[in-house]
Amino acid sequence: MVHLTSEEKNCITTIWSKVQVDQTGGEALGRMLVVYPWTTRFFGSFGDLSSPGAVMSNSKVQAHGAKVLTSFGEAVKHLDNLKGTYAKLSELHCDKLHVDPENFKMLGNIIVICLAEHFGKDFTPECQVAWQKLVAGVAHALAHKYH
């Protein structure tokens, strides 16, 4: 369980209300595939992922990134029940997709990087603390079925 102060929750919801899910989601997933190229093995049906440019401009990467970040929005809505929120996705990623749970941590950290880039000075160190707690909590909730 993630313990967030009321200030941290406020920071998370304030930033989230300004996030452009399509843009940021596509960027985050694309960055993960570029920075950690072994993760492309889960996306064989996405077509050309042979270079950073191909990954970042791939419409399937953009669409799936938006889907992932939309799902992440559920965490923002249910900050006090992340395990329950992600129970079905945890089962899917564990039992059917066989995704290494470390990937959840990597993607979470990349989401934080993207938010920092997009929001600049509004993404204060205190705000980053809140978001790091949240992405760690989401990663833990998604990995729950693996334990």
From Swiss-Prot:
Ranges of residues in domain Globin: 3-147
GO CC terms in record: blood microparticle; haptoglobin-hemoglobin complex; hemoglobin complex
Keyword match Metal-binding: yes
Stored InterPro entries: Globin, Globin-like_sf, Globin/Proto, Hemoglobin_b, Hemoglobin_oxygen_transport
Modified residues (N6-acetyllysine): 60, 83, 145
A GO MF term: oxygen binding
Keyword Zinc tagged: no
Residues bearing PTM Phosphothreonine: 13
Binding site for heme b: 64, 93
Residues with the S-nitrosocysteine modification: 94
Subunit composition and interactions: Heterotetramer of two alpha chains and two beta chains.
Function as written in the Swiss-Prot or TrEMBL entry: Involved in oxygen transport from the lung to the various peripheral tissues.
Protein name, UniProt field: Hemoglobin subunit beta-M
